[in-house]
Amino acid sequence: MYPVDLHAHTIASTHAYSTVSEYFQQAKKKGIKLFAITDHGPDMDDAPHEWHFSNLPVIPRMVDGVGILYGIEANIKNIKGEIDCTEKMSKKLDIVLAGFHDPVMGSLGMVDNTKALIATISSGLVQVITHPGNPKYPIDIKEVAKVAAEFNVALEMNNSSFIHSRVGSEKNCIEIAKAVLDAGGLIALGSDSHIASSLGNFERVLEVLAEIQFPQQKILNTSPRKVLDFLQAHGKKEITAFQHL
């Protein structure tokens, strides 16, 4: 079990089915020390209003020894790489994930998908790119991995993509992991949990990474401190409540 999950959705995204309290309970039960709540950005049809994200600090930082990161899974909106998380919003969040989602932007083809993703990565607003292996959005994998490493942005291996979402992602994800390794970048593990019982479930992703002998030191989730140092390298403030993690 990895002690950190960076991608989870609550009932604030109405196609997800668990509360923040239920996530804390599952995290404690599973031995997870740190998780991020990353509900969908406001351009998604059933996403929360932007006030949801600005009000996240009402949630206690620590509950029963488990820490929470205030986050968002933003939507990439166009070829310019713009996302539905403004710079003002980003400054109030601990972590910003971003990815392609059909209801907000359909595939533009490999060349323009790649341009959009590179623009998002280089914007300075995003720390993790979610499910980049989605076969609906072909990209130049090597080029994206190169730019992601340059800007210290992690590319996600999304467990949900191997189970019930984004069917056909596995081949692309293997190539992404290899490209990240060649480029000297980082992989982030995400359960993409839409129900609390899935928190920390990386089973299928880890099977794939084991097949290619992907090194642990290039996986972001191996410790809370590694994640927190990564976020501080992106200009995020130190969280005093997590000093012991």
From Swiss-Prot:
Transmembrane segments: none annotated. Pfam families: PHP. GO terms for molecular function: phosphatase activity; zinc ion binding. Zn(2+) 1 binds at H7, H9, E73, D192. Binds 3 Zn(2+) ions per subunit. Zn(2+) 3 binds at E73, H101, H131. Belongs to the PHP family. This is Probable phosphatase PMI1003.
